[in-house]
Amino acid sequence: MMKDWNLNLYDELVFCGYGEPTERLDDLLTIARKVKATTHLKIRINTNGLSDLINGKPTAPLLKGVIDSVSVSLNECSAEEYNALCHPKFGPDAYDAMLQFTKDVKNYVPHVAMSVVGVIPRDHIEKCRDIAAELKVPFRVR
């Protein structure tokens, strides 16, 4: 199917959207490897950071050499606020797993950042900015 697309018209391929791209991690990696081998494109994943919980194993090492950047949706400044906003199917373990994934993926992917949506309270945004700074990753309000 990809042979019909002129991917050279683009600079970056982003795996994101309504739903979590790492729910289909094997497919994501297969496509990313093929794109990497046949184009100049940079490859980014926009993720909720719950890939390890979703896949039942550490997943950050699988991204090495395949993914150029990862943007993790931090979403909130505490586990309680995160759970209230996101309702993760993994319950109270989700927030810490997302933070751990962010720490881990920095060892395998050249560019890692965190983001929040600008509709949460300003003081929460600033706390999120501090969390990203503690993790030594760029922070963006979207």
Q: What kind of feature is each model-predicted range?
A:
Residues 28, 98, 125:
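Aromatic/hydrophobic pocket-lining residues that form the small-molecule binding cavity
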Residues 21-22, 49-53, 72-89, 121:
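Conserved radical SAM core fold
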Residues 17, 45-49, 74, 116-118, ...:
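A cross-domain feature marking catalytic cores of carbohydrate-active enzymes
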Residues 57-62, 119-134:
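Catalytic cores of alpha/beta
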Residues 66-78, 140-142:
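Non-cysteine beta-strand/loop elements that form the S-adenosyl-L-methionine
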Residues 29-39, 102-110, 129, 133:
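Surface-exposed amphipathic alpha-helices with a cationic face
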Residues 46-52, 87-89, 101-124, 128:
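Conserved strand-turn element in the central/C-terminal portion of the radical SAM core barrel
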Residues 1-66, 78:
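Conserved Radical SAM active-site core
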